[in-house]
Amino acid sequence: MKRPLIFLILALAVLSISAVSGADNVTDIESVSDDVILAEDVVQDIYSADGGEIENTKSDSALVGKDTTGYEQFSTDITVSLMSNGTALASKQVIFNVDGKNYTKTTDSAGHATLNIKLSNGIYTAGFFFLGDNDTNPSNGSSLITIKSPVKTSLKIADKDINYRQGLKSVFIVRLVTSTGSGVSGKTVTFNVNNKKYSAVTDKKGYAQIFLSLKKGTYRVSYSFSSDCPYLSSSGSYNVKVKSPMSKGNGYWMWAGGIKTVNLKTLKQKGTKQIFLNSYAFDLYGKKTVTSWIAKAKKYGISVHIWVQIFYEGKWIKPLKSDGSLDYNLMKKKVSKVVYYSKIKGVAGVHMDYLRFGGTAHKYDNSVKAINYFVKKACAEVRKVRPNCIISAAIMPEPEMNKYYYGQDIPTMTKYLDVIIPMAYKGNYHKNTKWLNTVCKSFVSKSNGAQVWCGIQAYKSDNDITRLSHSQLVKDAKSCMSGGAKGVVLFRIGVTNLLNFYKV
């Protein structure tokens, strides 16, 4: 086989002309360490001294590249593969011609040569050439390089209603999105708050979150995303206001009549810090009498929360219309009720009970959405008028089934609440003391901010209201606390031996 003269003539011609795009489109060249080779430098004599043609016994080579897409402002890799009879050719020089300029790269052990280059927006033809050697014939090829505009991004606060309070470990969430609003997944976001740095990777919807445990005050949280092809960098900041801490969550639920019978002095002596007073007390005794009693309790160091029933009034009330959509009018009335009690003088908090479906949530598409909406709305409206009001909710003690049966989405609800109180009534569930520990651990792990104060049954069960002994109450309370609870709430005054919380 004779070495064709025409190949070198064509190679010289190609190397001497420009590619599709003009030379002024090249913005930067990265990692180009080899000298630029001019076509005429590679011309070799193609005839022997006696004027005869040299017989070619060399192997053929193949130089193959693929069409590539890159982005302006980012480097683009143009990679080719040099092979001969199925074998990779290593340590061979390959010439790339892009936008009128030539660059030389050397193949690696796999026969690959890569040019790393920055180009402006446009479409380019990249030529690549292997000029052959003593053993191998030359080869060449070309591919299209398409350079697109980079993708602009922004970082947005995902939820401005999240609750921050000293003593809580509250979630802080941002979302990385494109200019069209699509979430960007798998990217690292860096946070800086109170001279500490954190990082988190965005999920499939573009959300990145960290947890903040801060003392009372106002903090500037900054967050940023560094450019990562094809996405451009973005950043932002947000002020977080952290409220004052809560006292220990040790106390009791109490029916309205308790304000006439309970001994506040005795409760104080036993370390009681919280009483959840049923709102019916206002109907039964009037606002003046109740507020006077609340003031008296406060003198004993006991905080009073108004215990409000939400979606149960002798029967279950669905926060949904007949067509399954959210009943905003109903929920607005219920929110107003919660806000009303929060504004009463001396009230430390509002406690929402029956904040759920009665075991039928799975029958309605929007059940979870309705409960989440109500919790977020109620918390936001209360904090407009009483920023430091403690907002709590009673929840069912079934961590894996709360959403399915009751519409209680714990990770979402706990972003807004200060406290959740799982009603871990072991007698009703035919469970033992260890179960209380398990329940508390599960809810602590699911919380995105709210503390867990565990609600325990002070009597054997609803079928047997025999009071549990003080020693048994202590064991139950300790089990809750070892599970991560920050307090224990007993159900209830009137059917309980008073617990000495100092022994817990």
Label each PLM-derived region with a short phrase.
Residues V98, I123-S143, V193, K216-Y238:
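Enriched for extracellular/lumenal, surface-exposed ectodomains of secreted and cell-surface proteins
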Residues G251-W255, H305-Q309, A370-G407, A450-S461:
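Aromatic-lined carbohydrate-recognition surfaces of secreted/lumenal glycan-active proteins
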Residues K243-K273, I310, A393-P397, Y459, ...:
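Boundary/entry segment of secreted carbohydrate-active catalytic domains
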Residues G249-M254, V290-K298, S303-K345, V474-D476:
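Active-site-adjacent "subsite" loops/lids of carbohydrate-active enzymes
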Residues L277-D283, A348, M352-D353, Y405-K434, ...:
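Aromatic- and acid-rich polysaccharide-binding/catalytic face
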Residues A23-T69, S75, M83-S84:
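Low-complexity, acidic Ser/Thr/Pro-rich repeat tracts that form intrinsically disordered stalk/linker regions
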Residues G65-G86, F128, D161, R165-G181, ...:
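Beta-strand-rich structural segments
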Residues P422-T433, A450-V504:
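Substrate-binding cleft of secreted/luminal carbohydrate-active enzymes
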